[in-house]
Amino acid sequence: MSTLKITGMTCDSCAVHVKDALEKVPGVQSADVSYAKGSAKLAIEVGTSPDALTAAVAGLGYRATLADAPSVSTPGGLLDKMRDLLGRNDKTGSSGALHIAVIGSGGAAMAAALKAVEQGARVTLIERGTIGGTCVNVGCVPSKIMIRAAHIAHLRRESPFDGGIAATTPTIQRTALLAQQQARVDELRHAKYEGILEGNPAITVLHGSARFKDNRNLIVQLNDGGERVVAFDRCLIATGASPAVPPIPGLKDTPYWTSTEALVSETIPKRLAVIGSSVVALELAQAFARLGAKVTILARSTLFFREDPAIGEAVTAAFRMEGIEVREHTQASQVAYINGVRDGEFVLTTAHGELRADKLLVATGRAPNTRKLALDATGVTLTPQGAIVIDPGMRTSVEHIYAAGDCTDQPQFVYVAAAAGTRAAINMTGGDAALNLTAMPAVVFTDPQVATVGYSEAEAHHDGIKTDSRTLTLDNVPRALANFDTRGFIKLVVEEGSGRLIGVQAVAPEAGELIQTAALAIRNRMTVQELADQLFPYLTMVEGLKLAAQTFNKDVKQLSCCAG
């Protein structure tokens, strides 16, 4: 008999559920689970996976750990088998716990490390730079703070209520805004990353650069000097991505910005040129424009060219209304930088003439941070772009090496990374979890915002799905009318015949606040009629989803306010 200690059970019914789960694990002959004792006595076959046992319990929301090892004379003892599987103490430490190496400290890495510890593993987390990764330090958090500040500046300068509230030209104190922004970044980094790691004795943090020696060992070049070899039972690669820089002649010899430098700039340039039409490019372009810069965007195609064409058209129109110059189908063939008496000047050569600017932001996408990992020593498969190829369980081509987040071929969103990290940890500790991205919401924080989930019409047709779609302009949404801001639309894509909702695209102020409702509707396979029949609070933007659903069989212009 082997014993598991179980915490988290609250009644005898919990014990029944745990018993059922354990007896479904291959190799378990019987399980006697006691809520009062907080334990499970197991009759198991030799070779039964201890990871599978703890994962089965964890899947119910409880925590299981192995009790003391049985006597040496007992053949097939669970802890003995575990040590045989995982190696001796020189590899896993005196605790005998599964040892997981995590490379990185961003959203995927943190989620994985914490979940792995919860599952009973011991973690070594390796970070070459600042703890926290891209999102909190140089991505989501500082950019959204800057975007919000720019939005406030814009409203003071211009709003739909200028007839009754006098507009004014705001004074922008960029250094003060930057100090406020970075203080919040520091606060969140400590509260959500550094402090959590420091307080968890099962996680060891190494500050240095990791590379693979082989598929069982890492070499860590420590930041304070020296090297350390880290042997592991499982490894998670969560190294994120960095700004990609296009091979434009002359560009590398200039002091161009990526988003990293732009977010911590102490000044707002008079003239800003932006190469790229990525999400980052568009969000920062509008923010800088609202803070006082004259902004010109060079887009290789159109804005949002991969999305429904109406999205790009709506955002382009909004940008041009604010004085942002959008040059579509325009690329820089040469970039030069001319040093002046005080400040230099960028000169961009295009097929349509020269563009001169005080600063240049290059935001053409992000490339996975995999080049310096020596992955050729492991056999891990990469895409031609250097992204790690993974399956829905975050497994790479090497059985015990996993990957999650922006360094993989998954969508580059921090919430996707965190969800992937959690599932990777479950799988590394013997579980079987997959990440389903069929109803993944995405938001672009321009104004109006862009929010999407599920299929666009073109994507559905590409996959052989016949569709029926409706588009509701915001002049039919009471909240937008009350705001005196009817820019944008909500579009629903429905599977023809079944009436099932399969996609939503929205361009609207605060569109991000409505898209999760759409995601839940898609995930739960709701029909458009079922969505139309739901109760939505009046004078909210999300009510637009109901109204858009009603357009499939009604003329909403003929409905009274909040008509059900």
From Swiss-Prot:
Hg(2+) binds at residues 561-562. It holds the Pfam family Pyr_redox_2. It comes from the Bacteria. Disulfide bonds join 135-140. Its cofactor is FAD. InterPro entries: FAD/NAD-bd_sf (IPR036188), FAD/NAD-binding_dom (IPR023753), FAD/NAD-linked_Rdtase_dimer_sf (IPR016156), Heavy-metal-associated_CS (IPR017969), HMA_dom (IPR006121), HMA_dom_sf (IPR036163), Mercury_reductase_MerA (IPR021179), Pyr_nuc-diS_OxRdtase (IPR001100). It catalyses: Hg + NADP(+) + H(+) = Hg(2+) + NADPH. Binds 1 FAD per subunit. FAD binds at residues 109, 129, 134, 144, 210, 406, 414. Signal peptide: none annotated. A metal cation binds at residues 11, 14. Residues 1-65 form the HMA domain. Keywords: Disulfide bond, FAD, Flavoprotein, Mercuric resistance, Mercury, Metal-binding, NADP, Oxidoreductase, Plasmid, Redox-active center, Transposable element. One of its GO terms (biological process) is detoxification of mercury ion. Belongs to the class-I pyridine nucleotide-disulfide oxidoreductase family. Resistance to Hg(2+) in bacteria appears to be governed by a specialized system which includes mercuric reductase. MerA protein is responsible for volatilizing mercury as Hg(0). The active site is a redox-active disulfide bond. This is Mercuric reductase. The gene is merA.
